[in-house]
Amino acid sequence: MSYPHSGCSYTYSPVDFCDAAHRAQIDEAIRTQVPNFKTHYILAQLEERKEYFQRSIVLIDSRDGTVYPLPIDAFSGPLVGKDGAREYGKVETSLQADTFCVSSALLVYRAFEEGRFCFGFDGVRFTGHATQYMQ
């Protein structure tokens, strides 16, 4: 992780990308998915809190298995009043693309931000939309 972190979590984030549940989902993505971003990365969505339609995103380098978590806690579909999201957020990517976009409500450091957010990846760090964890 190229941003402030404590092992496998961004500082102040409740998401531990090294716990058994996340490792199992990452291992499954490596086994079953093909690169879908920037020629050799697998952009994988990991389940976080299904009851709130929340997922996280990781990039996995298909050449060596290195995992790069997007610096968010989770993303979901649009928030609908007090009930929250009623669907999953949408991710746009392609094998040759230099950016991917997330149309959603991003949850970062206990705050939501809604819209369409685009990110790039330079091989070490995410670029484009800046989240609180990237500060």
Predicted regions and their residues:
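Glycine-rich loops and low-complexity Gly/Arg-rich segments
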Residues: 67-70, 84, 126
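Surface-exposed loop and turn segments in beta-propeller and other repeat-based domains
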Residues: 72-83
